[in-house]
């Protein structure tokens, strides 16, 4: 018996000396390796009884565990909370709920769930996304706004049951709000904009796309009161008229991004107001605003010298008389979408090539008057910058276009759908020289001669087609 005890004591002493030696060596190694060695020593030197009593939540301090939980997303936190009582307390700690995204649970989220979450988060919550949660009502938002006054980022995209009442509570309690997405909240009106404008002066981003009930007055209130607003997204706001910015030009100096896609009532007067007021403008989308003419482009060329992205797809009244002065005045343009601007010719492309040296992406789809000559000029002037070129449905372009584009070093994608005079052989040759460039093209299958179909007696016409 004494011998066994002496052997056990000797083994324990040897183990202790070995552990000490490892610890000394660890000081000379990389910190990560040292940490792993110390961890392995801790695990391997525990007796079975000690292992049973040394769960992770007992070995690691609460502060460390909380830090680990802070890296988990909403779904992982919910799952972790079901492991044990200790983990439930840690997972549901308010400090882990500074950013909450319920998009994954959009179909299941009810008002009661959101209210409970608001009570749990309290003053910790800074970012909340209820994107697509169509079952959420004003009552849930009332709880959130009153209990989470430090909210800075809120997305209510497609929360169609949310009304002006929610915006009233946002203005009353959430004075730190700087990002608000109300896209497709179709019940929102100008009253909501009054509440937001009065109570959220730090707002820098607002998206009220497809909110049909919002009219000029609502947008004007926001621009007048929110001096830090630099991004305004108004896609599909059909209630806006050409005078929406007429009385607030002086309040648009901070605007850098403005999206007016499919605001059908806007005219050259609107663009003139934008150009006069939003002198810091870098991004403008007016696609499908089909009442604007060359006068709009002249105004932008005269005042919007910081413009980098301009989207004008579907603006069919625009032509060379507008784009040429635009190119001369907006020399920082990086992306320009002119799809369906079918009145432009090589003169526009040449002006862009000569003046807009930073141009990276250009869409010329359905610009049927442009030829190989202007593409050659564009390619020679933008060998180092051009990334994307969309040329689908440009019937005058030929194989020469690909020959010119072969030397554009930065090119990543070319669209050539329905360019009848560009051959398969030219595309194959291009891909051989530039295999890393995506080429999107389509060639209709050859229709079989009629006499071949007639000679197939006994086979129905459907089978011949198939």
Curated annotation (Swiss-Prot):
Gene designation per UniProt: fbxl-1
GO terms under biological process: dauer entry; defecation rhythm; regulation of dauer entry; regulation of defecation rhythm; SCF-dependent proteasomal ubiquitin-dependent protein catabolic process
Domain of life: Eukaryota
UniProt name for this protein: F-box/LRR-repeat protein fbxl-1
SUPFAM superfamilies, per database record: RNI-like
PROSITE patterns reported for this sequence: FBOX
Predominant place of localization: other
Cellular location(s): Perikaryon; Cell projection, Dendrite; Cell projection, Cilium; Cell projection, Axon
Transmembrane annotation, as ranges: none
Tissue expression notes: Expressed in neuroglial cells such as the socket cell and sheath cell, neurosecretory motor neurons and regions around the pharynx and anus.
Gene inactivation effect: RNAi-mediated knockdown reduces the rate of dauer formation following treatment with daumone, a pheromone which induces the dauer state. RNAi-mediated knockdown results in a 10-20% increase in the average time interval between defecations in hermaphrodites.
Quaternary organization: Component of the SCF (SKP1-CUL1-F-box protein)-type E3 ubiquitin ligase complex.
Organism expressing this protein natively: Caenorhabditis elegans
A GO-annotated cellular component: dendrite
Domain F-box: 54-100
Pfam families (UniProt xref): F-box-like (PF12937), LRR_6 (PF13516)
């Amino acid at each position: 018996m004494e011998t066994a005890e002496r052997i056990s004591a000797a083994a324990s002493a040897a183990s202790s000396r070995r552990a000490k030696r490892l610890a000394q060596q660890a000081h000379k190694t990389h910190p990560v390796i040292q940490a792993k060695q110390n961890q392995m020593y801790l695990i391997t030197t525990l007796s079975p009884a000690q292992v049973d009593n040394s769960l992770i939540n007992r070995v690691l301090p609460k502060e460390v565990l909380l830090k680990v939980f802070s890296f988990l997303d909403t779904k992982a936190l919910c799952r972790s909370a079901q492991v044990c009582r200790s983990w439930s307390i840690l997972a549901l700690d308010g400090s882990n709920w500074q950013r909450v995204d319920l998009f994954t649970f959009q179909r299941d989220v009810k008002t009661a769930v959101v209210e409970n979450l608001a009570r749990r988060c309290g003053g910790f919550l800074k970012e909340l996304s209820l994107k697509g949660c169509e079952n959420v009502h004003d009552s849930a938002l009332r709880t959130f706004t009153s209990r989470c006054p430090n909210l800075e980022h809120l997305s209510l995209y497609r929360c169609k049951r949310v009304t002006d009442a929610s915006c009233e509570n946002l203005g009353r309690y959430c004075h730190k709000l700087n990002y608000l997405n109300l896209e497709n909240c179709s019940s929102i009106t100008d009253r909501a904009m009054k509440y937001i404008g009065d109570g959220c002066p730090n707002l820098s981003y607002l998206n009220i796309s497809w909110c049909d009930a919002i009219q000029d007055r609502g947008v004007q209130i926001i621009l007048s009161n929110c001096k830090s607003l630099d991004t305004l997204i108004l896609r599909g706001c059909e209630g806006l008229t050409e005078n929406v910015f007429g009385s607030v030009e002086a309040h648009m100096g901070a605007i850098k991004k403005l999206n007016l896609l499919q605001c059908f009532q806007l005219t050259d007067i609107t663009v003139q107001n934008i150009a006069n007021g939003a002198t810091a403008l870098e991004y403008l989308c007016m696609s499908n605003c089909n009442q604007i003419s060359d006068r709009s482009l002249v105004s932008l060329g005269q005042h919007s010298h910081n413009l980098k992205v301009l989207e004008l797809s579907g603006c069919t009244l625009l032509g060379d008389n507008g784009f040429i002065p635009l190119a001369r005045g907006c020399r920082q343009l990086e992306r320009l979408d002119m799809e369906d601007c079918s009145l432009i010719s090589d003169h526009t492309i040449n002006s862009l090539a000569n003046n807009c040296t930073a141009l990276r992406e250009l869409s010329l789809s359905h610009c049927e008057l442009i030829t190989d000559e202007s593409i050659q000029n564009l390619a020679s002037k933008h060998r180092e910058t051009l990334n994307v070129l969309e040329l689908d449905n440009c019937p005058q372009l030929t194989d020469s276009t690909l020959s010119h584009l072969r030397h554009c070093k930065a090119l990543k994608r070319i669209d050539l759908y329905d360019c009848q005079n560009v051959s398969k052989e030219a595309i194959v040759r291009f891909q051989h020289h530039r295999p890393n460039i995506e080429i999107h093209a389509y060639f209709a299958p050859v229709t079989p001669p009629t006499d071949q179909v007639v000679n197939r007696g006994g086979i129905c016409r459907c089978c011949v087609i198939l």
